[in-house]
């Protein structure tokens, strides 16, 4: 079961332009026809900002800046439907490569790019006070599979994994399989959210098809789900079908701090 601190794909590894273009094409064209598929993705957009603290700055400085950023956004009526999360790497094979991941989740591309234009016009003073240096900015299309039932907590945990589909498997096939597994997991007490993430720009050349995100609103829920998978779900028909369609690896775990909840 499960982008963030090494660039969405290495975030953070790399492959050719044609495959990258193919991912984009199926991400868009998949919405045009639901024939032969049980579930319909409802995509959103997400921006992943990854980098290092400026000299003398730390996570507290970034969180403080984030709180000012949320106030600025409200005063300027900017991206009020956007959810913003600050993440910090916990388990990773290259933990020193980045200090943070800043995530913006936006409902659609029109709102994303319209608001970016506004940010470039009126947000420069705010940007000049940023206590970090972004080393990679990744634009993605996301297919949410599910969300945790309890969303009151602003603190949580997420695991990202790079996934490559087996021959003949499409993204829509994978989405249906994940939906079926998620329903099975929920019936066994699981309370995690899941999504498929397709890097669109900024990830470089990649050697995977998508990034799988598994996230919880609490450490307890996440730990329960890990145990529950091994004890009750790993040999289920839904899990075996899902795992037969895809190979996932390069997993990394980050803690999450939601500083703005989108008003959808």
Which residues does each predicted region cover?
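N-terminal hydrophobic targeting signals that begin at the initiator methionine
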Residues: 18-19
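Single conserved hydrophobic/aromatic residue that forms the stacking wall/gate
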Residues: 1-15
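Intrinsically disordered, low-complexity serine/threonine-rich segments
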Residues: 5-8, 30-32, 254
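Short S/T/G/P-rich N-terminal loop/turn motif that feeds into the first structured element of a domain
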Residues: 33-264
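Hydrophobic h-region of N-terminal signal peptides that target proteins for export
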Residues: 23-34
């Amino acid at each position: 079961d499960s982008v963030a601190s090494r660039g969405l794909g290495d975030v953070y590894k790399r492959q050719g332009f044609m495959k990258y273009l193919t991912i984009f094409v199926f991400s868009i064209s998949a919405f045009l026809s639901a024939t032969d598929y049980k579930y319909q993705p409802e995509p959103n957009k997400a921006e992943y900002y990854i980098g290092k603290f400026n000299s003398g700055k730390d996570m507290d400085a970034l969180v403080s800046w984030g709180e000012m950023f949320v106030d600025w956004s409200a005063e300027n009526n900017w991206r009020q439907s956007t959810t913003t999360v600050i993440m910090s790497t916990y388990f990773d094979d290259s933990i020193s490569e980045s200090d943070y991941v800043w995530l913006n989740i936006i409902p659609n591309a029109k709102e994303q790019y319209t608001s970016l234009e506004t940010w470039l016009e009126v947000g420069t003073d705010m940007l000049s006070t940023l206590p970090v240096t972004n080393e990679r900015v990744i634009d993605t299309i996301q297919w949410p599979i599910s969300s945790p039932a309890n969303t009151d907590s602003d603190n949580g945990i997420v695991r990202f994994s790079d996934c490559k589909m087996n021959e003949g498997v499409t993204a829509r096939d994978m989405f249906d399989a994940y939906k079926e597994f998620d329903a099975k997991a929920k019936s066994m007490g699981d309370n995690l959210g899941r999504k498929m993430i397709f890097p669109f720009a900024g990830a470089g050349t990649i050697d995977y098809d998508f990034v799988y995100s598994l996230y919880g609103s609490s450490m307890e829920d996440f730990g329960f789900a890990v145990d529950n998978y091994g004890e009750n779900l790993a040999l289920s028909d839904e899990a075996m079908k899902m795992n037969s369609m895809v190979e996932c690896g390069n997993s990394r775990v980050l803690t999450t701090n939601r500083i703005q909840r989108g008003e959808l």
